[in-house]
Amino acid sequence: MESLVTLYQEHIKTLQQRAQQVLARHSLDAMLIHSGELLTVFLDDHTYPFKVNPQFKAWVPVTQVPNCWLWIDGVNKPKLWFYSPVDYWHDVEPLPQSFWTGEIDIVPLKNADDIARLLPTQRQNVAYIGPVPARATQLGFNTEAINPPGVIDFLHYHRAYKTGYELYCLRQAQVIAVTGHRAAKEAFKSRLSEFDINVAYLSATGHRDTDVPYGNIIALNEHAAVLHYTKLDQQPPEKRRSFLIDAGAEYQGYAADLTRSYAASEGSDYAQLIKDMNKEELELIATMKTGVRYTEYHQQMHYRIASLLLKHQLVNGLTAEAMVKENLTGPFMPHGIGHSLGLQVHDVAGFMQDDRGTHLAAPQQYPYLRCTRVLEPGMVLTIEPGIYFIDSLLAPWRAGKFSQYFDWAKIDELKAYGGIRIEDNVVIHKNSVENMTRDLHLA
């Protein structure tokens, strides 16, 4: 395997080529990419946890340091002004010395405001890429040069194609997340509360709750019916029935996003539903290949969901085709089959069909699908089918013309389990699909 240094060198070479293309297209001399700034809580002297600009960490794995700047012209070595003040109140990151620093010209920035005099004076044909437009204005950028849509679209579109370095980071994020998932499963078996299961996960991954790429979903019993449940009860339920964990990790700025569902009793109907869903999810992934639009796999999964509902007699008397046509599967799986994954959990440009920003929306029947791209080598996506028992979504069907086909007694019994979601992270290769999650034997 190539060394991390070599992988990063090739990564920077690719980013420099992309920079040359986008700068030439928009008649620009350079991009100034801002890591971001700390945001102060209203009427307080505390700040919110820092979240770095994703376009910044695409170039350098600096994720915890505000007030940093990158000057990119596509030709010369990228220049990084690294914020390293004299400060006895807070921890200060030293100037980095790592696998990546040989490819970057690093200059210390002692005072955040010094950047105004350190930047090249000629900024007329430079684009500011960052989260603080007011700072860009102070530095003399006009409105058209602040996050210009054409530049952003180009950068976003090409982020779908991961470099070898990015794939390495994504695989490492998987390793960390899988470690956490195994610890969380053991905590569930030990009858711990949602709060304590989350503590076990964070401890195993070495993350703080502000470091994980998204808020961990640790849902026991009926809480699994809340798609983004993040409350974390501090007391365990009187009776354990189910556990849904949707939790990720981050490595050098790249995310993992994994979900598993577990039954407290292996002999329950719910446990069998998990096994059958797991089988359908793996079979769907086995069909994935380049040249097929991601939307197709979402639609295929709805046919598989229909078959599961029929097999478990939650719906009766209809064909799978009729169920999908009439959207009877919709209330059971109300979200998309997945999304792009990378520097962000819901990575950008899922609807973008070219690097000029052409948009293809999700089908009207499936408005929450987050990706309509045609699969190509280098893309990384999640596959995360689910079946849930959500009162607000099932209520119209209970009163509707298809009500007779639902076994409401069985559905009501399963409501106490909340739902099921199983999520793997996959890489599209030219002639194969790599399941990063299953390669680490997370059942």
UniProtKB/Swiss-Prot annotation:
Ranges that cross the membrane: none
Top-level taxon in the UniProt lineage: Bacteria
Keyword Hydrolase: yes
Enzyme class (EC, first level): hydrolase
Coiled coil: none
Gene3D superfamilies: Creatinase/methionine aminopeptidase superfamily, Creatinase/prolidase N-terminal domain
Keyword Hydrolase included in the entry's annotation: yes
Record field: catalytic activity: Xaa-L-Pro dipeptide + H2O = an L-alpha-amino acid + L-proline
Pfam families: PepQ_N, Peptidase_M24
PROSITE patterns linked: PROLINE_PEPTIDASE
Cofactor, how bound (note): Binds 2 manganese ions per subunit.
GO MF assignments: aminopeptidase activity; metal ion binding; metalloexopeptidase activity; phosphoric triester hydrolase activity; proline dipeptidase activity
Any single GO BP term: proteolysis
Keywords, ordered alphabetically: Dipeptidase, Hydrolase, Manganese, Metal-binding, Metalloprotease, Protease
Gene Ontology CC: one annotated term: cytosol
NCBIfam families, alphabetized: PRK13607.1 (NF010133)
Function noted in UniProt: Splits dipeptides with a prolyl residue in the C-terminal position.
Protein's recorded name: Xaa-Pro dipeptidase
Gene (name only): pepQ
